[in-house]
Amino acid sequence: MNNQSSSFELLHDSVQKWIWRQGWTSLKDIQENSIPVVLRRDTDVIISAATAGGKTEAAFLPILSHILSNPSEGFDVLYVSPLKALINDQYRRLLDMTAGTDMEVTPW
């Protein structure tokens, strides 16, 4: 990861390691801009970008970081998607992102 990524430094160690395993050398602009805002948790956030623009990780990386940094019992996140195929794709991605953690991911 390049040395200019302050958003990367905000992420939980497990999430940073996942990013390294992906071979990423930098975050996309949408991720750089979204991560600090999502982590602040003081406002609603809409993330908009072109297809394959990095939206999913712009949301999931800070959400997973928060959950890993602040473990709780019970229900943490409900992520709603309009398409079954998209749910299945995101489920597979989340399983990969959460591998090696105690986090449970359930598609429904």
What does each model-found stretch correspond to?
Residues 1-9:
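Compact, charge-rich alpha-helical regulatory domains located at protein termini
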Residues 9, 17-108:
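Conserved P-loop/Walker A NTP-binding site and adjacent catalytic elements of P-loop NTPases
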